[in-house]
Amino acid sequence: MKDFDSRLDTAWWALRIGLGLAPIIAGADKFFNILTDWTMYLSPLATRVVPLRAATFMHIVGVVEMIAGIVVLSRWTRIGSWVVMAWLLGIAVNLLTTGMFYDLAVRDVEIAVGAFALSQLTAVREA
């Protein structure tokens, strides 16, 4: 950590907390649908391929998201940030295949870029 510029600490902590808490909150909400009805974001392709009810599938998605958020907040931040990045890119592809929600797909790609930045900052910080 001696080569890590301490001026980057604020950015690293902001990314780590944001990319850790957001998946935990969104993942937990997959069970309650307070923020939104998450099943409406599943593409018709996904609902045909996945042999589960949409709500059941979203519960599984919620568990994965909560685990990813916890990993980001743990000592495995770099691994967690890669998982969050890949997960968000997968969500963006799903959103694009709905034929709607292009704005959300772009947002998720941008958040994935933030997760990539966190992985790179963490790598330098841990070096």
Features from the language model and the residues they span:
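Membrane-interface extramembranous regions
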Residues: 1-127
